[in-house]
């Protein structure tokens, strides 16, 4: 029995050694790898820095294109609006330029009238014709806007003041209702209304309310 156990153990050890040697023979260890023939056939990849630099350059190119198309580049929006407003104001006709042009027209007309007067005086010596030939200067009168606003309004028109109460807000509606009630009481106490109600109502409606 003892001899059989020894032989069994020896057989197991020999089998294990044989397996280990077979594995070592199948997978030999190579310290130096051979050259890969496809090592230089891979595609070049862009790094993050290269991508960021490309994006930055394209963004700068777009900005340059916009700046070449627009004269207000590189300034804030409010400054651009101010410049555009100034350009619009410069395009509008100015009062001083209008006055100078009117004065030039008056001078040209007066010079032409004087030439005609001299021509008629040289041709005719009749005093009546000479009096008719005297040129009359055209004078431009400047009227203030206040006088234009004070023109007479037609009957039945309603004049609304700038500081009149507004019916849309609560305070204005309250004030308007108070004014209407006072006006209604005045109409009722009027003698003409008591004698002829419809005629007086018609006259009051035609009157100016404000």
Curated annotation (Swiss-Prot):
Protein name as annotated: Ribosome biogenesis protein SLX9
Biased composition (Basic and acidic residues): 10-22, 35-68, 118-127
Biased composition (Acidic residues): 104-117
Superkingdom per UniProt: Eukaryota
Gene name linked to the record: SLX9
Species the sequence originates in: Candida glabrata (strain ATCC 2001 / BCRC 20586 / JCM 3761 / NBRC 0622 / NRRL Y-65 / CBS 138)
GO cellular component, one term: small-subunit processome
Lineage: Eukaryota, Fungi, Dikarya, Ascomycota, Saccharomycotina
Family indicated by similarity: Belongs to the SLX9 family.
GO molecular function: G-quadruplex DNA binding
Principal localisation: nucleus
Reported function: Involved in ribosome biogenesis. Required for normal pre-rRNA processing in internal transcribed spacer 1 (ITS1). May be involved in the movements of the replication forks.
One Pfam entry name: SLX9
Region Disordered, annotated ranges: 1-127
Compartments it resides in: Nucleus, Nucleolus
S-S bonds: none
GO biological process, one term: ribosomal small subunit export from nucleus
Subunit details: Interacts with the 35S, 23S and 20S pre-rRNAs and with the U3 snoRNA.
Keywords: Nucleus, Ribosome biogenesis, rRNA processing
Listed InterPro entries: Slx9-like (IPR028160)
């Amino acid at each position: 029995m003892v001899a059989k156990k020894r032989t069994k153990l020896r057989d197991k050890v020999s089998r294990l050694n044989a397996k280990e040697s077979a594995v070592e023979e199948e997978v030999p260890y190579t310290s130096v790898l051979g050259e890969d023939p496809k090592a230089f056939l891979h595609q070049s990849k862009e790094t993050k820095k290269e991508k960021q630099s490309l994006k930055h350059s394209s963004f700068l190119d777009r900005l340059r294109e916009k700046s070449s198309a627009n004269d207000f580049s590189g300034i804030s929006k409010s400054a651009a609006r101010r410049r555009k407003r100034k350009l619009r104001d410069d395009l509008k006709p100015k009062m001083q330029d209008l006055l100078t042009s009117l004065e030039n027209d008056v001078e040209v007309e007066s010079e032409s009238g004087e030439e005609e007067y001299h021509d008629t005086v040289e041709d005719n010596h009749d005093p009546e014709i000479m009096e008719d030939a005297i040129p009359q200067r055209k004078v431009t009168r400047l009227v203030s806007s206040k006088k234009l606003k004070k023109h007479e309004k037609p009957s039945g028109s309603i004049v609304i003041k700038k500081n009149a109460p507004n019916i849309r807000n609560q305070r204005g509606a309250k004030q308007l209702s108070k004014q209407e009630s006072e006006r209604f009481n005045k109409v009722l106490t009027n003698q003409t209304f008591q004698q002829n109600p419809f005629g007086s109502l018609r006259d009051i409606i035609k009157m100016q309310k404000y």
